[in-house]
Amino acid sequence: MTTESGPANPSDERAEMPADRLQAIVQLCRDIVRCLKLDLAIDSQAVSGTTCINLSGPDRPLLLAGSGAVLNSMEYLVNKVFRIGREEYPAIVLDSDNYRQHREAELVLLAQMASEKVLAQQKPLSLQPMTPKERRIVHLALAAIEGVRSQSQGDGECRSITIYPS
């Protein structure tokens, strides 16, 4: 669906990832996993115009430790390598057995619980530092809750969200 101002979803305009690039992405993921000496299997698929790489296996807990720090770092690196100067291609998402979906649900629940605390105490509350993607999920969840507003604060990896009563 399009509107006068453009496509309803900006990713609708993006080109599908060519098969040879997808193979190269999977190979880079294999190389990273091998260098890290992790025992992980790698699958790839296109989902709703997004290139998804799934990593699974016995070393999955190492990949997801620290709120998915290694997984997030790998995803960042793979996107930098394969999308620099090629924004027409969709973002590359690295996941591990639906970790991203579970993490999003956790963040929405965190936003709901934190907003309840802010509303009850009528005092601001700062959350732990988060990645830009995680902060976006929390901001969107908080935007749907009446009586609170949110603001990102800090710099770099220490950037976090503070929730205020409206």
Which residues make up each language-model segment?
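RNA-contacting regions in translation and RNA-metabolism proteins
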Residues: M1-S166
